[in-house]
Every structure is written in structure tokens, then in C-alpha cells.
Amino acid sequence: VRFVIIGNGAAGNAAAETIRKYDENAEIIMFSSEAFPEYSACALPDYISGWIPRSHLFLKDYDDYKHKQIKIEWGQSVTEIDTVNKQVITEKGMTKYDKLIIASGSRAFIPPINGVNLSGNFVIKSVSDVDRIIEHEPSQVVVVGSGNIGVEAAEALEIRGCKVTLIELLGRVMPKAFDAKASALLYKILTNNNIRVLTDEKVLEVKGLKQVEELVTNRRNIPCDTVIWTVGVRQNVELAQKSGISIGKLGGIKVNSRMETSQQDIYACGDCIESIDLLTGQPALSLLWPNAKRQAQVAALNCLGKPTEYEGSVNIIVEEIYDTLCVSIGFTEEMLSGRDFQVIENGNERFYYRIVISNGLIVGWQSIGISNGIGTILALIKTRTPIAEVKRVWQNSDLVAKVPWYLTAGNFLFHEFSSI
């Protein structure tokens, strides 16, 4: 059986490794638009800051593919999928497939405003992007967008010695991950480390002759030589779309719980798909590494004839910003607008935690400066275990002896958060 995989990122590699794990004889062919082995996109800010050398970004070397008998076509983009004859087409020719996995990922979005084509505008999505930033030798930098990538980029550039301004259109830092109190603590961490943070501010244009010289917002003009755009991504679905594969209402490739697309023998996983939110059962775009890897495993197992269903995606953000652990799992309060929920929170100027509960289930967690219990909270959210059930087992020594994990969960919940 020949398996063809489009994409050499986290999802593509997880799919290839899963196929090889269960089938030593399978023929695996991957197409990579980049010329690099798999690397950690999460570590790109650490390369910018100088915390790690460039070589430490890479999770594999070229020989690793050979050792696992994975044939990879470097620097080749698939331009067409012939679903009738079951073949993919590149500028160098065509390749037949028995099963096809699309893991085409996503690309950074830059808004269509004046000045974004000037030298000095960058995104942070690939090794090549960061190579170009470092080669540019930035000094005065504006980072536009304060999501997790924007915050990490701002920190990395400040550590590198740049004067950094971080701009957010909405009213607080990391608004999709943190409610107001956690965000306020993060704001303080950033500003205490010489990052200028501007919220409720809209970028209107970038000015300069050939090179970035100034960024203009609705409130001010900011002198700068570099603009880093971290305002979101767009799914790479054009190839799938023109091949007759259905696209979901949120813009990702539509798949079922087995990662099957609308075309027979074609699967998709990772950033390019529209998956299901574990907590709501509704379509969601979840552009996070753990979800991409699990989706890829599910796609590969179903390709191999091993029926497996994807449980659903959970939003998980774990960042260390200036040595302070910042974590967001599941829903924020804003996401639950219109539903019944309860919030339990505590904190001071150094740490903060917030648990969001709805219908007896923990559906959200936010913490700043706290590391204990995060694995327990994640497990409770992913398994949708009712708090009442944890307490029932935890209080019964005979039951808890049979399910020791409930002891850990109960100790954490009912000792740390007595009001639950």
C-alpha cells in the first residue's frame, strides 16, 4: 500500500511515524514545500532571542527519514490532486497514491493595508521567516497582535536587545486565552520587562520609502524599523478546494471523526482542518501542536484500517514568559457568554488561578505563575469527568483504591479549592 502525505510539519510527521509503527512494509512518500527536516515552530521565538542555536530547532535530520524508509520530496509543492486516478501532481511529475493524507498546515495572515510590502515587515511561521528577521538586524520593533505568538515574539526581541512595542486591537493582552485578571498580570510582566504594551489600538498603515520607518495607529505614530505581524493565520485549503474536497464553514478542510474528507481515501489533519471542539461538539479551528499530532495519529490509523475516532480538540496554551508560567486550557468566561457557569479564582500580585465550571464540569482553567495541578485539570477537562463523581470516589477509600488517579484529582481539587 502506498501512503502519500502532503506536508512535513507536526501533523505530517506524526502521520508518517504512526503508519511506520504499525506497518513496516508500507510505502510512505511525503511532499515538503520547505527544504528543511521537521522542526519545532514553538521554539522559533527561542531562536530569535538567542536562547537556543538554530540547529536546536530541528526535531529530525535528513537521515532520520531514510532510516524510517520515508521517501521525502524536498522543496516540492503539490499543485493538484487527481481524485479520479488517485494521484498527486507537482511541477516535476505525478505520484500515485492508495491513501492520501493532507497536512498542508496554515500560513500567517497580514492585513491588506498600506505599507505591508515595505522591507522590514515579517511574520513568524517558519525557520526561513526567522532567518530573515535575524538577518534584518531589527532595532525598533512593533509586534502587531498579542496572541501567544505575539507575546513570545515580543519577549524574544526584547531579550535580543530591541526596543519593543506590542499592539493589540482588543482591550487586553492574549484576549482569546485569558480573562481580565490573568491578562492584567501578564500585562504587568511584559511592561516590567521594558515592553511597551498598547491595547484598544488599531494599526492603520506602515510608512516608509523602501524600508519600514513608521507604523501609524488610530492613536499615534510609532517610529520603527521592523514590524512583526502576529494577527492570525489562514488554513492552506486551496489545493483541497480545487480538488473537490469540501471546506467547512469556518474555512478549514471538513473532516469527520475519523479524519476522512469528502473524497474517498483522502484524509486530512492538523492546522488545515476544521475539527470538533471536545467541550461543545461544534466545529472549531484548533491550531495547536497537541491537537495536530492526535489528529494525524487518528488519520493514519484509519488509513491502516484500524478504526479510530478523534475525541475532539481542546484549546491548550502553555507559555513561559520571563520565567513565569502562563497557562490557559479550555474556555474563558467570554467564550461561555450566555451559558450558566461558575468561576473560582484566587491570586495576588505574583500568581493567579481561575477555574471555570459549567454543568458540574470543569471547562476552563487559567493560571499565571502556578505549575502544580495543570496535568490533573487537563485530564479532568479532556475526560469530561464530573466534579461530583471525583468527590464521590475520592471520599470512598475502597473506590479510590481501585482508581488511584481520583485520589490525585480529589486531593488537588478539594484541598486547593475548598469552595468547589
Regions found by a protein language model. Give the residues of each.
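Beta1-alpha1 glycine-rich phosphate/pyrophosphate-binding loop at the start
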Residues: 1-71, 156-177, 376
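Mid-to-C-terminal Rossmann-like scaffold of FAD/NAD(P)H-dependent oxidoreductases
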Residues: 1-2, 272-375
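FAD-binding core/adjacent interface of flavoenzyme oxidoreductases
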Residues: 1-4, 58-144, 214-221, 228-230, ...
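Residue-level detector of alpha-helix initiation sites
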Residues: 9-13, 35, 106-108, 128, ...
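Rossmann-like dinucleotide-binding cores of NAD(P)H-dependent redox enzymes
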Residues: 58, 140-142, 149-205, 288-292, ...
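Short loop/edge segments at beta-strand edges and connector loops
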Residues: 74-76, 82-83, 125, 168, ...
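FAD-site-proximal beta/loop scaffold in flavoenzymes
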Residues: 117-138, 208-214, 218-298, 393-394
